[in-house]
Amino acid sequence: MNTNRITAVLLAVFIVTMFFSCKNIRKKPTTAITFDTIVVARQIPLLQNDSTLPYADVDFKFIYPVKFGTPEDLARLQQIFVGTFFTDTQYDTLSPQEAVDKYLEKYIASYRALSSDYYSDKSRLPEGETPVWYYYQLNISNKILFQNDSLLSYAVEYSDYTGGAHGSYRIVYYNIDLNDLVTISEEDLFIPGYYKSLTDIILRSLMKKYNVTAPDSLLTKGFFTIEDIVPNNNFWMDNKGLHYTYNQYEIAPYSMGPIDVTIPYEDLKPILKPDNIIERFFPNKENKKSERDPI
């Protein structure tokens, strides 16, 4: 009888424990993110009703979150994505689709305002010739580079042509702390006064990449000046390190394209804050399973 009673008590304790454990599991907030994409591919004639005129090719590929945590969390995450995609805070109060529509509307109005200049330039050309510099292009896209339960890193790429000798291209990175839903900058990672030390680390990394032994030797590789090579806050993060990019004309000529440099966390240890968030984001930096392929 005592044995049966003990068994019954233990079974009851087990059931109660499992019940509350399951409740806790269900209540635990999820950091899983579901994404959707808005794609725009339009050819905008300089005048609305004249397809014989120059036009602007406009292409957007906007990846944005549609499911994440609570409704408030999702709204905040979408706000960050919208604001960083269009690089203007006037859009971050809009839904992703509203922001795309508004940006496109403003771009079309700005492009078509050039029509009077087009006819003025055309009148100065030999008959039958067209001012081809009014053929414009605009491409904006983003892609997810890294994601785990605490961190989301992504890139926004811009390329455009507005009639000059060549188009322009730039890539900008953003890192979001998924726990606090804020973007991360160098100041969040490094101790006060980090700037000079980080500059030296970046410089050494570039010297290694370009296989030179002295900073001035980078000038022979095409870099403008050594003084231009400084931290620029344009980095993304994964469990390997920080990945910096310097865009065209930032530290080198257009012909060299964007300059990329990766810095392992081991090299950054002396300037990381004592309570640095790197350890929180990557409790086991050797674990490659938290990485994901770019979207």
Where are these regions (language model features)?
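Bacterial N-terminal signal peptides that target proteins for export
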Residues: 1-10
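Compositionally biased intrinsically disordered regions enriched in Thr/Gly
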Residues: 23-295
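C-terminal motif of bacterial Sec signal peptides marking the signal peptidase cleavage site
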Residues: 18-21
